[in-house]
Amino acid sequence: NLLEGLRFYVSFACTFAFGELKLMEGSAKILSLIARDEATHLNLSTHVIKAWQKGDDKGMSKVMKGLDKTVIEMFKKCVEEEKAWAKHLFKDGSIIGLNERLLGTYVEWIANKRLRALGFDPLYDVGANQNPLPWTQHWLSSKGLQVAPQETEVESYLIGGIKQDVQKGQFKKFSL
């Protein structure tokens, strides 16, 4: 759940910020697809963990007993590592609309959201409706996504779909 739901979000936000500035848009779009794929994995792992918490799998429910402190510590460590990455990225300054402090708050906001989804209390003082980077949402959501044909690769073209049995001299009588 940490890997798909919290890790890399500093990097995602930075890449999306370039996309917002109309720089490196291709990279931002590709990372947007990767982030959406990670969201699918996140939904699956959240569903499985919640099923274990409910007791749907007695063996896994037994394993999970007493792991709450470990889960919380793992979230705290992940948040600190993401913040350290943000600090490294912005050691020489910020970019328009993004800096180390905003990214730190963003990571805390995401961590709280992920914790709530698993039935834990939030750890950080960032409200559920206080996304510090609301502009990232359209990069992370598939809603309203429409790709113009000229902006995507079409892979359905038939390649090699013509007969290539032309004989030497076949067009001798042909003139323009």
How would you describe each model-predicted region?
Residues 1-176:
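Non-heme di-metal
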